[in-house]
């Protein structure tokens, strides 16, 4: 089949996700052509998706790696970008939320999330109402944040072409740590909170700015699948105990 052959060729240099998106458009066109009598059969459903499964980029750093990175960042406090990385690791805030920080959004040992800067839009509104929140900081992190001189546009951090993940990759490589993206720092913060039995899921949901608890629960199961397996085992043990 010619269409399948073309899809196979395309998939050699594209991810499975991208190939699937292209194939869906082709199927829609073929279905339209069939519906208007331009094709004898609607063979689009027979065409299969190929392509490479992309490696997950937003991986969480291990607790050990998190400690190494945090200790380095607390020492290397002259670089504005590294302070931003420390803030992301410390708060779990999204990149856009940190770029949206202004001096008036900083309180003693805390920051207020009120805006979000995006590379694709001039709209600085937050994703949801729950995204509007107050995040506590350790005093040493707060002092480093206060050392940054605000920019002429009123914000604390320079978007710097939105290349934070690239710069982070180079920093992690230099420190010999696993490579992740800026969003991976948010995942790392969340994983650290999830690992503590003393911190409630409600608090974590509020700190991450999730729209509801279910979003946080789904996030939890994605980040820590081994916990789900353990809970499955605990649930079965509990049910078995009822018959003893």
Where are the predicted features?
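Basic, Lys/Arg- and aromatic-enriched nucleic-acid-binding interface segment
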Residues: 16, 20-22, 35-41, 45-95, ...
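Active-site/catalytic core of tyrosine-dependent DNA strand-transfer enzymes
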Residues: 138-178
